[in-house]
């Protein structure tokens, strides 16, 4: 028997009813060590870094309802940023001081062009956002010291995918940046609101990734590889939301495999797409002339090439040599321009598939999957194939133990084809 279920459906799950306690993030204590991120079994701690103005602009645009005051706040944001930078740097140097929300709202509430209602709306969203700058020198203080205004804000969002296992709190230890609290309706609403805000933000910019290079990860320093988890496409390489046990020891390994593969292979796919696009342009420009030249210099190779194109690409290949010849005769002579156009269509489709295809609804349109996974008799086969929540956003197959290696190799062959 063969069963099929949709990929990555776990991303839409809620584990609110499955946990009694949820980690609460205290940004003033966070050092951006990333230990909680890599240990979480449920991809429930998405994290990123941004410019302060990017965060404030997003908050104003989406949470302040009065249009005129929204515009006034937009115009005031550069001044707000400039007004609090020195205090932020001083606080970060001594690793204590006011929260970002307190600093921002202290300036905003003095603005006569902003009503109490609009200020409260901005304050309401900033209150629940995880905005860290005090003890994250790689994101804020080191950059700010080199160039005023360059320091960013680090955020760890607690997702509703969390099962409340507490592994992140254990890893955080005495830092107390993550502490387990009772999961009330009010707190659950806060973490959902915060993660919805996160979806409005752009991805982490390269300048906040340190010695990790997002475009050429192979050139990154090994110690900086933890930062690849700050890039959304890498962190979301496994979606979770499945029925694995709370505190599962297998899923952090799966997440590491999937995220590192995504980090390495996605730029490779995009570079391949760019090469194909360049070849496509050259073929459109010179292809017909080159074919004419080939026909003059080597008629046999010219005929073989056109026959291969008509056979493999244009669908004229039959079950036998005789059948193929009949199809060719019925179709008629294929012009050089038709043969070149057929190859161009293949290159165009391949370039699109490698760079712009949206393989799953609701996910980035950045190309087809860079990996597949075969499971055979184990925990992964159970929580991965239990509807409705599948954690795998790539081709995933579950089979009996004796078939797993063979079928997985077949999946691998499909990537090579």
What function would you assign to each model-found segment?
Residues 1-156, 161, 169-389, 393-417:
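Ferredoxin-type iron-sulfur electron-transfer modules and their immediate structural context
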């Amino acid at each position: 028997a063969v069963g099929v279920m949709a990929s990555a459906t776990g991303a839409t799950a809620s584990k609110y009813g499955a946990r009694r306690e949820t980690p609460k993030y205290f940004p003033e204590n966070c050092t951006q060590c990333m230990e909680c991120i890599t240990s979480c079994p449920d991809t429930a701690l998405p994290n990123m870094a941004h410019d302060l103005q990017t965060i404030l602009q997003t908050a104003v645009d989406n949470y302040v309802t009065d249009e005129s005051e929204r515009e006034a706040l937009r115009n005031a944001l550069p001044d707000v940023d400039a007004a609090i930078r020195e205090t932020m740097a001083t606080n970060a140097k001594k690793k204590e001081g006011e929260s970002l929300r307190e600093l921002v709202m202290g300036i905003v509430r003095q603005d006569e062009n902003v009503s109490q209602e609009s200020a409260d709306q901005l304050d309401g969203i900033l209150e629940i956002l995880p905005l860290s700058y005090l003890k994250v020198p790689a994101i804020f203080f080191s950059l700010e010291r080199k160039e005023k205004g360059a320091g960013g804000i680090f955020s760890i969002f607690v997702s509703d995918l969390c099962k409340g296992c507490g592994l992140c709190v254990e890893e955080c230890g005495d830092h107390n940046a993550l502490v387990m609290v009772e999961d009330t309706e009010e707190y659950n609403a806060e973490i959902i609101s915060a993660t919805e805000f996160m979806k409005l933000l752009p991805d982490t910019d390269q300048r906040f990734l340190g010695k990790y290079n997002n475009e050429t990860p192979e050139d990154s320093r090994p110690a900086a590889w933890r930062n690849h988890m700050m890039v959304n496409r890498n962190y979301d390489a496994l979606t979770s939301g499945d029925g694995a046990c709370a505190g599962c020891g297998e899923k952090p390994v799966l997440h590491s495999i999937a995220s590192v593969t995504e980090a390495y292979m996605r730029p490779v796919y995009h570079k391949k797409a760019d090469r194909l696009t360049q070849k496509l342009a050259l073929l459109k420009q010179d292809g017909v002339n080159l074919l004419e030249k080939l026909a003059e210099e080597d008629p046999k190779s010219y005929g073989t090439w056109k026959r291969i194109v008509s056979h493999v690409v244009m669908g004229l290949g039959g079950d036998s040599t005789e059948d193929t010849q009949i199809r060719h005769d019925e179709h008629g002579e294929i012009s050089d321009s038709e043969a070149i156009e057929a190859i161009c269509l293949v290159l165009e489709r391949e370039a699109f598939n490698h760079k712009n295809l949206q393989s799953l609804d609701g996910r980035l349109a950045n190309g087809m999957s860079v990996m597949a996974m075969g499971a055979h008799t184990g925990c992964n086969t159970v929580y991965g194939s239990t509807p409705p929540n599948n954690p795998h956003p790539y081709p995933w197959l579950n089979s009996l133990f004796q078939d797993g290696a063979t079928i997985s190799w077949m999946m691998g062959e499909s990537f090579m084809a």
